[in-house]
Amino acid sequence: MKDTVKNLEALRQAMRKSHVDAVIIPGTDPHQSEYTSAHWKLRDWVTGFTGSNGTAVVTLTDAGLWTDSRYFLQAEQELEGTGVTMYKEDGGNDPTTTEWLAENLEEGGVLAVNGLLFSVVQASRLEAFCGENGFRFATDFDPFPEIYADRQALPLDKVF
């Protein structure tokens, strides 16, 4: 929990430096795999949530984690005391990530992602969402080389 609070603050400092108001951090790698090498567990590092499914959204003042029903209990336990709120992806009255952003990001705000971690379709949808809501969309935000000092290197193992 202590590291999560520290990691969230490091991310927020990088956001301020880059003039980013919100960032989406998926739990996937550039191949859209839910089961990633340690190098790509960026959402885990920021939120403390270690389940294989989940998306984090962080603003300068709030943070949320969206996950499916397989991980509701785990997420509640791992997020306790971190300042990250759990939202249910499938069921209940919780907002979607974009509904939450529409309520928590001011017009003209910058929503940023690391474009390597999103498919063209996902990025296009986010770009359209931003346009409809008066937000700016950036796909080149990757603060982790600077803020995640002990991040594991990319694996060099053969795929097959």
Residue ranges and their predicted role:
Residues 1-107, 114, 118-160:
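N-terminal accessory/capping or targeting/presequence segment of soluble
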